[in-house]
Amino acid sequence: MKNICLLGATGSIGEQTLDVLRMHQDQFRLVSMTFGKNAEKAIPLIRTFQPKYIAVGDMDTYQKVKEASFSHECQIGIGEEGLIEAAVMDEVDIVVNALLGSVGLIPTLKAIEQKKTIALANKETLVTAGHIVKGHAKRYGVPLLPVDSEHSAIFQALQGEQCKNIERLVITASGGSFRDKTRQELESVTIADALNHPNWSMGAKITIDSATMMNKGLEVIEAHWLFDIPYEQIDVVLHKESIIHSMVEFHDRSVIAQLGNPDMRVPIQYALTYPDRLPLPETKRLELWEIGSLHFAKADFERFRCLQFAFESGKIGGTMPTVLNAANEEAVAAFLAGRISFLSIEDLIEQALDRHSVIQDPSLADIQEVDKDTRGYVNSILT
């Protein structure tokens, strides 16, 4: 029996993680969970899974949970302190970080210090502080298990292989909601258009990131840190069916790919069961004859400027990826609030990157200060 802490229980990854736990109640037990403000969704989950510890985003949500009736005893925490407490509980074996944004960084570091296995769906943790997180994981001997489908695919393809034999990583991208639109057509797209992803069921922020291809850019940076691969050996290819989740090419030109129907429960479960596998009967079996053909195209950096920003920021390193992430989070929030157009997301990110003076090998305090400064700058443009 593995004891699980789930950070971000009411988000898309959180919900699908709970699906996996529900299917394998003899294998996993939820001992702590966190969520932001969605008490209406969380309270039934608390009653079903009966975690010992719950952390919420603010005092209003705390009161709602406090006033709810549960058949079991549970403690309730608030904010970052609550996130940390949930992650470092003695009983916890695996911390699933399904939080949205850079808020996942500190709880992850604290969990690593307590030698908890990390199942990482929160890519911003590695984007903003990859050198710190990887250094921490190495120091404490803690595995970082990828939950993103692309990184899970690479991780699976590398089982039994030596990293020194890697020629390149090929990360696949659906192209998002607007993969067939020209830049001129993108000038008039709506929020509803952007949230209509063709293949995956995801939260609002990551769906917008998919439409701008920033999500793929963040995944490139994450792959760099997870697998210690230079950016020059990471490629992105458009693959609209989302059947091949990513590939590894070796020096002898052999390519190993991981395939499957788009279902996040597969990589989530693999992270929880690694190095073993369990049946996942609720996911659809891949029948290649039903698909018939698979399509690929080269990623156009002029068409997908956010992808270019990510590669450039990653290569520069230091605090530049922190600026990239913070500016993107604020710009996407502004778009979802109806304050800016879709293409303005790129413009705001570019302005934030252009003004930044990079700090190489930043401390955690440096990263937090740059993150705060960047968010303030982007919002000053918006007002």
UniProtKB/Swiss-Prot annotation:
InterPro entries: DXP_reductoisomerase, DXP_reductoisomerase_C, DXP_reductoisomerase_N, DXPR_C, DXPR_C_sf, NAD(P)-bd_dom_sf. Mn(2+) binds at residues 148, 150, 219. NADPH binds at residues 10-13, 36-38, 122, 124, 203. Signal peptide: none annotated. Pathway: Isoprenoid biosynthesis; isopentenyl diphosphate biosynthesis via DXP pathway; isopentenyl diphosphate from 1-deoxy-D-xylulose 5-phosphate: step 1/6. GO terms for molecular function: 1-deoxy-D-xylulose-5-phosphate reductoisomerase activity; manganese ion binding; NADPH binding. 1-deoxy-D-xylulose 5-phosphate binds at residues 123, 149-150, 174, 197, 210, 215-216, 219. Pfam families: DXP_redisom_C (PF08436), DXP_reductoisom (PF02670), DXPR_C (PF13288). It catalyses: 2-C-methyl-D-erythritol 4-phosphate + NADP(+) = 1-deoxy-D-xylulose 5-phosphate + NADPH + H(+). Its cofactor is Mg(2+); Mn(2+). Disulfide bonds: none annotated. GO terms for biological process: isopentenyl diphosphate biosynthetic process, methylerythritol 4-phosphate pathway involved in terpenoid biosynthetic process. Its EC number is 1.1.1.267. The keyword DNA-binding does not apply. PANTHER family: 1-DEOXY-D-XYLULOSE 5-PHOSPHATE REDUCTOISOMERASE (PTHR30525), 1-DEOXY-D-XYLULOSE 5-PHOSPHATE REDUCTOISOMERASE, CHLOROPLASTIC (PTHR30525:SF0). Belongs to the DXR family. HAMAP family: DXP_reductoisom. Catalyzes the NADPH-dependent rearrangement and reduction of 1-deoxy-D-xylulose-5-phosphate (DXP) to 2-C-methyl-D-erythritol 4-phosphate (MEP). NCBIfam families: Dxr, PRK12464.1. This is 1-deoxy-D-xylulose 5-phosphate reductoisomerase. It comes from Bacillus velezensis (strain DSM 23117 / BGSC 10A6 / LMG 26770 / FZB42). The gene is dxr.
